[in-house]
């Protein structure tokens, strides 16, 4: 007998080892989307996002049913994450539940994670301030004690910067140094001169404002007067239009310039420090006192002209 009859023929389209059963393929009834995977481009040039059903036409046997992929994060309730800084805010929770689309807009605060340290720091600062307020307020209310503690730290605790020449005090050292410039002599080395006109200044802010007066770029179209700043020109234009947008809340008097309104508001103040020596009348502004002295008191103090003898 030839040796070829002793060898078992094996089909060319399959392979089977002894003791190992051949794998059975079953068609997928539905297409399952695998997150993060993309198939090869199709005929229309687009990438397929899902797996097509298998084309194997074999014997139908019950196979294992694939379970849908679970989300990477558990679905969060809207009330569970109420912090807008949390990465799992209400928008992200709705996205994982499938209620929100990818096109939902997110603010930048949604991408910052807060670990709570800043809140604890603010809470600790509030507690320290409340404790200081209770100590300074003598057992008063929480709000009043806190305000009392803050005012005591500013006024009572009291580090004020005093000028050695005139004794005037300031809250900050920068304000004091700016004030000390006014005590300089025009002949000192610290004085500066204007590069255009040569005028000397001991205060650097005053020199900076003076330099701007040589560059009058903003000119009035009505009278031709020029100004260094646009808001100065805007206030000047009100003198041509007669507009007075700044009104007094007490008497209703209107002004074209805000600074004039501030000066007028001093007349309604209860503090009137400038007193006339002749009639004992007090004024809130020194300029008003000068006008009063030049107009009323001076004329009242002058003796009436004596009548000449009748001829």
From Swiss-Prot:
Entry keyword set: DNA-binding, Metal-binding, Nucleus, Repeat, Transcription, Transcription regulation, Zinc, Zinc-finger
Comp. bias (Gly residues): 124-146
InterPro entries, per the entry: Snail/Krueppel_Znf (IPR050527), Znf_C2H2_sf (IPR036236), Znf_C2H2_type (IPR013087)
Region of interest (SNAG domain), ranges: 1-20
A GO term from the CC aspect: nucleus
Function: May be involved in transcriptional regulation.
The protein, known as: Transcriptional repressor scratch 2
């Amino acid at each position: 007998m030839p040796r070829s009859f002793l060898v078992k023929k094996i089909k060319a389209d399959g392979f089977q080892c002894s003791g190992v059963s051949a794998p059975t393929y079953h068609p997928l009834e539905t297409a399952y989307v695998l997150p993060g995977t993309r198939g090869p481009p199709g005929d229309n040039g687009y990438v397929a996002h899902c797996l097509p059903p298998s084309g194997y036409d074999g014997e139908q046997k019950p196979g294992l049913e694939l379970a849908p992929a679970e989300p990477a994060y558990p679905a969060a309730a809207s009330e569970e994450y109420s912090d807008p800084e949390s990465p799992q805010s209400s928008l992200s929770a709705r996205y994982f539940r499938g209620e929100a689309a990818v096109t939902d807009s997110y603010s930048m605060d949604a991408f910052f994670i807060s670990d709570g340290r800043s809140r604890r720091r603010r809470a600790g600062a509030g507690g320290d301030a409340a404790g200081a307020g209770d100590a300074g307020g003598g057992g008063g209310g929480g709000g009043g004690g806190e305000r009392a503690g803050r005012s005591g730290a500013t006024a009572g605790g009291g580090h004020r910067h005093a000028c050695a020449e005139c004794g005037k005090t300031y809250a900050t050292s920068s304000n004091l140094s700016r004030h000390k410039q006014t005590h300089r002599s025009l002949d000192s080395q610290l004085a500066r001169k204007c590069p255009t006109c040569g005028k000397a200044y001991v205060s650097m802010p005053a020199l900076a404002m003076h330099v701007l007066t040589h560059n009058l770029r903003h000119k009035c179209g009505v009278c031709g007067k020029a100004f260094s700043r646009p808001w100065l020109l805007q206030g000047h234009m009100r003198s041509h239009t007669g507009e007075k947008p700044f009104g007094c809340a007490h008497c209703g008097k209107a002004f074209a310039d805000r600074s004039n309104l501030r000066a007028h508001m001093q007349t309604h103040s209860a503090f009137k420090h400038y007193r006339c020596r002749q009639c004992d009348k007090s004024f809130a502004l020194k300029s008003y006192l000068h006008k009063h002295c030049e107009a009323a008191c001076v004329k009242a103090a002058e003796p009436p002209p004596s009548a000449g003898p009748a001829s």
